[in-house]
Amino acid sequence: MSEEYVTLKINGEEKNAAGKTIYAYLSEEGYDTSRVVVEQNLQIIPQDQLENTLIQEGDQIEILCFVGGG
C-alpha cells in the first residue's frame, strides 16, 4: 500500500508529509505532544483533537513548544 503525500508548510517551511493526523506527525518528529500548541490554518487545535485532525494538502501549520526553566 503506497502512502499519498501532501505538500504543506510547517513553521514556515515547505514539507511533504503522508496524509496523517497531526498527532502522528508530532510523534514521528519527536515532539512532546503534552508540551505543544498547534495552529492549523490560523486555528488552534485543542489537545484532545490532535489525534483526530488530519493534515490536508496546502495546510499551514505552526507548532509552538513550551520549555520550562528559570
What residues fall within each predicted segment?
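Ubiquitin-like/PB1-type beta-grasp interaction modules and other compact soluble beta-rich domains
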Residues: 1-69
